[in-house]
Amino acid sequence: MVQVVLGEDEGIESALRRFKRQVSKAGILADVKRRRHFETPLEKKKRKRIATRRKRRFR
């Protein structure tokens, strides 16, 4: 879970920016988008296979 503690002299805008950055680093939005619709086992395998190819290419 992502938490942002507001500093004493910190504005809401900067805290919101930090929160958005932490959420994107944690991959929460990508996970929510992926789980929005049911994914069949075949689609899961295909997604994982593509991710593996991407990882190999950038190594």
From Swiss-Prot:
Which GO terms fall under molecular function for this chain's record? structural constituent of ribosome
Query: By what name is this protein known?
Result: Small ribosomal subunit protein bS21
Q: Which family does it belong to?
A: Belongs to the bacterial ribosomal protein bS21 family.
GO BP, one annotated term? translation
Cite the HAMAP family for this sequence. Answer: Ribosomal_bS21
Annotated organism of origin: Acaryochloris marina (strain MBIC 11017)
Q: Which gene encodes it?
A: rpsU
Q: Which GO terms describe its cellular component?
A: ribonucleoprotein complex; ribosome
Enumerate the Pfam families for this protein: Ribosomal_S21 (PF01165)
Protein keywords: Ribonucleoprotein, Ribosomal protein
Tell me the InterPro entries matching this sequence. Ribosomal_bS21, Ribosomal_bS21_CS, Ribosomal_bS21_sf
